[in-house]
Curated annotation (Swiss-Prot):
Keywords: Cytoplasm, Leucine-rich repeat, Membrane, Methylation, Mitochondrion, Mitochondrion outer membrane, Nucleus, Repeat, Ubl conjugation pathway. It is found in: Cytoplasm; Nucleus; Mitochondrion outer membrane. Residues 277-332 form the F-box domain. This is F-box/LRR-repeat protein 4. InterPro entries: F-box-like_dom_sf, F-box_dom, Leu-rich_rpt_Cys-con_subtyp, LRR_dom_sf. LRR repeats lie at residues 376-397, 402-421, 427-448, 452-474, 480-501, 504-524, 532-558, 559-583, 584-609.
Length: 621
């Protein structure tokens, strides 16, 4: 055979994998909606009546707007029958996630995105709901009461959260997914996507959210699961599937690219013998590495099977310096980490967010991985990784001496004593403890030893007893601090704010939303404005006492301001806002929702005068 043919074969396969996504035009939602074999072709006997049920319990979630000790705007509102629907508007009885739009991605605290994230993974938040009865799902309805369109993926799990013993197997299956789309709907809606039929019963449903295209916070009221107790029989009618319908998402599911199959591919040594590598060995090693940098993890796994030369390149640790495993949370397990271990000896950025839950990753498996791969780690993302315990944090503190960035957001099952180990990571520059059970003693120790901190998130940390003491320590020790999240801290006063403002002059971002003990009459907000001239983002959400004096101080001293949230104040007038907008030329987001002096007419006038500023004013119908 001519030597040209092996080269053509490998090049064709490589070209196909690299450029395939550009050749697809259909969305995944269109594909699933075009597979009509399931949509209307199941039949049931009278004995197999459809079960319709609301969620019994909220099992897990990644974030919410509300407090840990309240029901207002929390994910727990998704349990049970609707509270608001069919009304629309901003209601406290709904479930609301912490962010919307791209505003948080534009802040100084926003982390750099991971490269090589698959284009089909765009989920930002999730919530998992348990239902009373296991059924074979026929429909999932989501009641959206404000700014709909955030749900982009619905999954079902084989595990029964109410089963007394651990499940023999845990499987997640995607029922429906779609790319983020802009929904122009001003009224509440019942979102009823056409779902795929699965071959196991479920009472655990997961919604994944992307709010990047929303104009304001999405609000969800309830979720309804329709299904059959017995497995429905498909009719003989089948559908013909156009090959053009197979987009990348579908291709990855049908072509054995799930992470469990990738494990086998990575460990395979049964590669073809001989020099048939398509003459890739004629290219410089560095050039091949540069080309492979554009491939996702599944693509690397596929390419590794073509020949020994490309297998060597695909297994080179240089390909895994930045490793994002979050998109594969549904399949990633101890075996996955074991197979990746030899390739991750140089890993510097590692994202394990959302992974390992329900026994997928063990403490032993995580520890083995870090003992081999932790020495070069600079950044470690572990948001919502509920397998973590104190041993895991101890291992991190011992095996990751170069760690600068640690995210434990919503790891709410970590015991309070576990956080003391973080104090050993003296080089930390970013620490996210949002919705964790960190206590004051451990936090003060962390602040004492981690004096290089630049970004600190303590939002919704309800176990911290005295935020004034915490703020004083931050001001004394963290002189390099640039961003601080104190969202819903329960007891900080003007004393803590004074220590903070005088000790952290470099602050560019400060979130004091829903901090009820701060009063403008003490001068705390005016002091912030005078002492923090570099502020770009300031959230004073739901502080009723913010007044014109505070706004005028911001206008005079914080001309770099980009985002300001003063939702809920009664004391701010349109005149002071106009001064602010005239002084702060970079201002792009201004939330004046429920500000009693700022009516719709004032918003329209200010928007007309300052068209580059997004002025938000929420409403309740």
């Amino acid at each position: 055979m001519s030597p040209v043919f092996p080269m053509l074969t490998v090049l064709t396969m490589f070209y196909y994998m690299c450029l395939r996504r550009r050749a697809r035009t259909a969305t995944r939602g269109e594909i699933m909606n075009s597979h009509r074999t399931v949509e209307s072709n199941s039949r049931t006997s009278p004995l197999n009546a459809e079960v319709v049920q609301y969620a019994k319990e909220v099992v897990d979630f990644s974030s919410h707007y509300g407090s840990e000790n309240s029901m207002s705007y929390t994910m727990w509102n998704l349990a049970g029958v609707p509270n608001v629907f069919p009304s629309s508007g901003d209601f406290t009885q709904t479930a609301v996630f912490r962010t919307y739009g791209t505003w948080w991605d534009q802040c100084p605290s926003a982390p750099v995105p991971f490269k090589r994230t698959p284009a089909n993974f765009q989920s930002q938040d999730y919530v998992e709901l348990a239902f009373e009865q296991q059924v074979y799902p026929t429909a999932v309805h989501v009641l959206e009461t404000y700014h709909p369109g955030a749900v982009i993926r619905i999954l079902a799990c084989s595990a029964n959260p109410y089963s007394p013993g651990p499940p023999a197997e845990v499987r997640w299956e995607t029922l429906w997914s779609e790319k983020p789309t802009k929904v122009n709907a001003s009224q509440a809606r019942q979102f009823k996507p056409c779902i795929k039929q699965i071959n196991f019963p479920t009472n655990l449903i997961r919604l994944e959210i992307n709010s990047s295209l929303l104009d304001y916070y999405t609000e969800l009221d309830a979720v309804v699961l329709h299904g059959m107790k017995d497995k429905p029989m498909l009719s003989l009618k089948t559908s013909l599937i156009d090959m053009n319908d197979l987009d990348e998402d579908d291709y990855e599911e049908k072509d054995d690219c799930e992470i469990d199959n990738l494990n086998k591919k990575f460990s395979s040594t049964a590669l073809r013998e001989g020099p048939s590598n398509g003459y890739f060995d004629k290219l410089p090693y560095e050039l091949i590495q540069l080309i492979l940098n554009h491939l996702t993890l599944p693509d690397l796994c596929r390419l590794a099977q073509t020949c020994k030369l490309l297998n060597q390149h695909c297994c080179d640790p240089l390909q895994y310096i930045h490793l994002n495993l979050q998109p594969y949370w549904a399949k990633l397990n101890d075996t996955s980490l074991e197979f990746l271990q030899a390739r991750c000896t140089l890993v510097q950025w590692l994202n394990l967010s959302w992974t390992g839950n329900r026994g997928f990753i063990s403490v032993a498996g995580f520890s083995r991985f870090l003992k081999v791969c932790g020495s070069e780690l600079v950044r470690l993302e572990l948001s919502c990784s509920h397998f973590l315990n104190e041993t895991c944090l101890e291992i991190i503190s011992e095996m990751c001496p170069n760690l600068q960035d640690l995210n434990l957001s919503s790891c709410d099952k970590l015991p309070p004593q576990a956080f003391s180990h973080i104090a050993k990571l003296c080089g930390l520059k970013r620490l996210v403890l949002y919705r964790t059970k960190v206590e004051q003693t451990a936090l003060l120790s962390i602040l004492n030893f981690c004096s290089d901190l630049q970004h600190l998130s303590l939002g919704s940390c309800v176990m911290i007893e005295d935020y004034d003491v915490t703020a004083s320590m931050i001001g004394a020790k963290c002189k390099k601090l640039r961003t601080l999240d104190l969202w819903r801290c329960k007891n900080i006063t003007e004393s803590g704010i004074a220590e903070l403002a005088s000790g952290c002059p470099l602050l560019e971002e400060l979130d004091l939303g829903w901090c009820p003990t701060l009063q403008s009459s003490t001068g705390c907000f005016a002091r912030l404005a005078r002492q923090l001239p570099n502020l770009q983002k300031l959230f004073l959400t739901a502080n009723r006492s913010v007044c014109d004096t505070d706004i005028e101080e911001l206008a005079s001293n914080c001309t770099r301001l980009r985002q300001l949230d003063i939702l809920g104040t009664r004391m701010v007038s349109p005149a002071s806002l106009r001064k602010l907008l005239e002084s702060c030329k970079d201002l792009s987001l201004l939330d004046v929702s429920f500000c009693s002096q700022i009516d719709n007419r004032a918003v329209l006038e200010l928007s007309a005068s300052f068209p580059k500023v997004f002025i938000k004013k929420s409403f309740t119908q």
